[in-house]
Amino acid sequence: MNMARNVTDLLALSQQEELVDLPENYPLSTSEDEGDSDGEGKRQKLLEAVSSLGRKNKWKLAERSEASRMVSEFNVTSEGSGEKLVLSDLLGSATALSSVAAVKKQLHRVKSKTLTPPLNKEEADRALREAAFSKTSQMLSRWDPVVLKNRQAEQLIFPMEKEPPAVAPIEHVFTDWKVRTPLEQEVFNLLHKNKQPVTDPLLTPVETASIRAMSLEEAKIRRAELQRMRALQSYYEARARREKRIKSKKYHRALKKGKAKKALKEFEELWKDCPNAALQELEKMEKARMTERMSLKHQGSGKWAKSKAIMAKYDPEARKAMQEQLAKNRELTQKLQVVSESEEEDGCTEEGIVSVSHGMDDLQMNADGVNPWMLSSCNSNAKRGEIKTDPEQMPEFVAHVSSESEGDERPVAEELVLKERSFQERVDPNNAKLMDGQETEDSDSQEVLQKLNKESHQSDNQKVSSEENVLHIQREDLASEKLLVLQRLERAHVLEQQGELSKEEHYPKKGLSRPLLKGDWKEMKPLTNPDASGGKKKKEQMIDLRNLLTANSSPVRSLAVPTIQQLEDEVETDHKQLIREAFAGDDVIREFLKEKREAIETNKPKDLDLSLPGWGEWVGMGLKPSAKKRRRFLIKAPESSPRKDKNLPNVIISEKRNIHAAAHQVRALPHPFTHQQQFERTIQNPIGYMWNTQRTFQKLTVPKVGTKLGHIIKPIKAENVGYCSSTRSDLSILQSSQKCLSRKQQKQLKKLSSAD
């Protein structure tokens, strides 16, 4: 600063007028004498300024050295006096002013009161925390309605702010588009060649040019023609919609037949006009049929078929499409059977064989595919159907069916014994006499067996008159039935040997004799000795399988019209018979009992053996710990409580606690519910798509929170809820107490305010 001031003084002095050198004898006047003195003063100042260059001395204030009447308050000194200067002495002359009186009062008030000392660190922190807590609680209390609303909402979808979709006009998209592939190049060439517009106006440039070239009359004719075409198009569309809604099978059959005739007629005309083209068309049709059959695209394993199968429950069009596809699949995969001349002479037409194959397909196909349990029965039925298409053999087939239906109503045990006896009589008549000793004690069952024997003899007489191939097929069927009988009797024998089932009062306590094969009759003769009490032979006891996979006998039918109850009973018996035939080869009951026995053993408490080898005795190869020591360190398990399924032979009740299921158990009433009955009623209602419609199922299983892919979920703002943001006013209490805070706390407050 001193350097700058010196430089300014030098510049000011340089601008003064230069001194003129005069001769030594030149006389000076009084005015000139004064100017000379002024010049010397200026020169003296210049020398002082030059000498002060480079020094760092402060600018010296000018001091008053002479006495004066006017005393200034800006430069008051107390030198020369023994007393100090007091403020009241200076204000003594200003007592009359009103403003000065107010200042005096303030001075007296300040003088009378002492200043409070600053707060220590602990108290300052406590005051800061209290102020921050009160203000923060006041700020957060505004969000209570928003939080409550979000908690009670059924579904929240984020992000909440819906951004308007930015749709760019097609002109901008088209300008930035660049052709990259040869296909795009060809498309663009065609568009520009035909002058197709970029946008989608009502008329193309070609149409506008043609309209402009037309006269008024031509335009009217053209307009009328277009109106007529639109009317015809609407008529055809309405007619097609009406035809599509027709559900008559007869109509669709006639329509399909008409289309087939029309196609055949067109093919004949094409054959007459151009045989080569007709051959090519025929070859194309055959090739298309071959490719469809090889690819098997009409099955239900494709993506389209799976999607249609999902919607078939709700959409009748999808159901119809699935039925058409299955019909097409059956038509393509059907084996074409060539009929020989001998079969044509016997009267076996091609239609009968195709119907049998259709019946086979219907029997073998179910919802998931081929049923392996029905293969044997279907094959036997198919053979019978192919052979018994002769009208002379139809009564025998009807009698066979009626005998089967009546056999379903009889007890199963009588049916088994009858089949075994009839099979023995057919295969070996000499050994049939050995079966006479295995009759039942009940007179009613004996009469039923006699009637059944008569019916079997009558059927045998009819079958003897048939051809040799029919006898061969019947022997195969009887052999399969014999195996079925043996398996069922063996399974009943195993059930009777079980200790758990023998305790039940529903099952007979006497043992069941295993059915004997043809080679076991010789071994049976020395064993069949009379009892000690009497010389009578033991008769075979009838098997009571009512508690197994059997149906109760239905009452005898009357010749009147069957009632609804009888029809329902017939359906039930047929269903149970189908189950028996399906599980004939599997020993389901034995496996079930084995599984139950294993479950009981695993859940039974086990003894704890605490004996350690090598403590108090020798240990090595071939040495076993003593039984006394094992008994000493053996902790026996407490007796378990009796199982709930102890007296239930066909039930397994698992008493093991499932940890995963226990995690989902409710120990307290959930948040939305207020009563226990309300919660239980809600839990009992099914939410699956098997019990509800598709729309209701989607509503019940909608997620609580829904998000969109690729969207950023930002925190909620006060502006979105309807509040005005006042972050600066929120810190007003904190900023008012900055004086009693430390520097570190003040810096933190500044950071908070700058962040807001």
Curated annotation (Swiss-Prot):
Source organism superkingdom: Eukaryota
GO process terms (BP): cell differentiation; meiotic cell cycle; rRNA processing; spermatogenesis
Tissue-by-tissue expression: Expressed predominantly in germ cells of the testis; weakly expressed in brain.
Keyword Nucleus carried by entry: yes
InterPro entries: SSU_processome_Utp14
Cellular localization per UniProt: Nucleus, Nucleolus
Skewed-composition ranges (Basic and acidic residues): 419-428, 452-468
Family of the protein in this entry: Belongs to the UTP14 family.
PANTHER family (alphabetical): U3 SMALL NUCLEOLAR RNA-ASSOCIATED PROTEIN 14, U3 SMALL NUCLEOLAR RNA-ASSOCIATED PROTEIN 14 HOMOLOG B
Official protein name in the record: U3 small nucleolar RNA-associated protein 14 homolog B
